């Protein structure tokens, strides 16, 4: 999942499960204001999910947890080798968000179900895109 922030530049935000990504978007500012902590990958609540357990790289990259004060989500920092590097990139990118030019996108990967698609379609973002290669007959 990615957030495209401004000036046509796409910033990779690594990987969320579809469920956590929708939760993240549902309170974007709350989560972005939360403190990023790191956990041992074996402590991930998603470690047995097919999209995580099937990844041969699992356990070799940092896993972060964010809280908005009510709920927590996990972020898989696939492209970083250390917690320090992941934190530095995360904090730098948060500072660069242009809220006036925010575009959010979602796709049908990482455990996406019709429930997550329905929630995404209802999110109040002015600019959003959903990429899919499937038919979603129950969605209008």
Predicted feature descriptions by range:
Residues 1-116, 126, 137:
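Positively charged, amphipathic N-terminal segments that serve as targeting/anchoring signals
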Residues 118-121:
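Histidine-anchored nucleotide/phosphate-binding helix
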Residues 132-140:
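Polybasic, proline/glycine-rich intrinsically disordered low-complexity segments
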């Amino acid at each position: 999942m990615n957030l495209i922030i401004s000036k046509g530049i796409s910033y990779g935000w690594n990987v969320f499960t579809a469920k956590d990504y929708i939760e993240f978007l549902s309170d974007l500012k709350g989560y972005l204001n939360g403190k990023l902590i790191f956990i041992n990958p074996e402590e991930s609540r998603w470690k047995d999910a097919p999209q995580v357990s099937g990844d041969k790289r699992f356990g070799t990259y940092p896993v972060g947890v964010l809280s908005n004060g009510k709920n927590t989500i996990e972020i898989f920092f696939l492209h970083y080798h250390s917690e320090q590097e992941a934190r530095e990139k995360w904090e730098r990118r948060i500072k660069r968000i242009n809220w006036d030019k925010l575009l959010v996108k979602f796709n049908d990967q990482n455990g996406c179900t019709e429930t997550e698609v329905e929630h995404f379609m209802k999110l109040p973002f002015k600019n959003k895109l959903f990429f899919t290669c499937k038919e979603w007959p129950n969605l209008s």
